[in-house]
Amino acid sequence: CARSPLSDNQFREQLFARLPPGTKGLEKWPDFAASLHYQPVTYDRQSFLKLAAYLGELDHAQGTGGNRIFDLAVPPGLYPVIAELLGESGLSRETGLAEGWARIIVEKPFGRDLPTAIALNAVLHEHFREEQIFRIDHYLAKETVQNTLIFRFANSIFEPLWNRHHIEYVGIIAAEELGLGSRAGYYEDAGVLRDMFQNHLMQLLTLTAMEGPARFDADAVRAEKVKVLRCVRPLARDEVARWTLRGQYRSYRDEPGVDRGSQTATFGAVTWHVDNWR
């Protein structure tokens, strides 16, 4: 669903038009497309009640049991608005309008700073149980990142050496060749620190420095990541200039939509000290 006033067929035609040339299995498209539906919504309670009713009709017709995943591919400022509307319309299952499960997916940026992140968390918990909430970092889906834990803890060669006695320092580099493109509005507000450091690179830091989890499940891995973050030495205000660096690529201010006097950082470097035995 989205705000554009499309019919099911128009939505399906748009998706079909985006299939790359040479896509295999196109003979199965009609059957697959019959399961694709579109519902126009605006950000108000009446619209979400209509969405709930429409999903109920689809559940009855297709026997889906009310199982739903709400992936909020919207501007971050709308996360709390949509979470409240999902709860008020019964789609979060808090009101028991359906028997199946519900999940809500939100991706970074999760708030602009600590107060807004806490406020967003409070809104989500008002309408969803913690087990229903998925805070996604798409960087973790990269194959190299997913292989990090296996590379470390299933490898009898490297794990015994993965400590301060054998490694002087670890450098984590996320280099991109692409410029700003069409992201000026977002990037001018976020900058490289919010865009990369407090999410993607922090995840890589914890995966690199964490201890082996008791079990390879979400709760156990998360617990070990949190232990790493608690061991990161905080930077005092007078240490920031010593341990951090900010920069901006030369043509950034020439990009469409960027202020000619912009001070937004497109490059950043931080030295962290992890104060644990490893």
Where are these regions (language model features)?
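Secretory/organelle targeting and membrane-embedding segments
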Residues: C1-V106, F110-R278
